[in-house]
Amino acid sequence: MVLEVAVLDVKSGFESDFETAFGTAQHIITGMDGYVSHQLQRCLEKRSRYILLVTWRTLEDHTVGFRGSDRYQEWRRMLHHFYDPFPEVEHYTAVFPASA
C-alpha cells in the first residue's frame, strides 16, 4: 500500500467553496483502479490548510493510472484553481504498520 500525502493551501476566503467542490469531486478518485481509501482533514492552526490522504495499492495507480486519466483532468478543473501555492504531493509506505 502507498499513502499519498498532499498539503493543500486553499486561497483565503474560498474554504467553503473548496469543501463543496471536494465533496463533489471525491467520487472521481473513488472509482479509480488501485484506489483504497481517502480522507480530507482541515488544519486547526491554519484555517486555509488541508491535508489530503489517499491510500493506493501501488505508486503507479496514482502517478500513472490516475494522473494519466481523463478523470484527472476533471479533478484538476474542479479543484486546482483553489490552491495557492500548488500543493506538494509525496508518497509514503508504512515502516511500522498499525497493529490491532
Regions found by a protein language model. Give the residues of each.
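Glycine-rich beta-strand-turn "strand-cap" elements at beta-sheet edges
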Residues: V2, Q39-K46, R76-A100
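Intrinsically disordered, low-complexity segments enriched in polar/charged residues with Gly/Pro
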Residues: F14-E15, Q26-I29, L40-R42
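Residue-level signal for secondary-structure boundary sites
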Residues: S16, E60-H62, P97
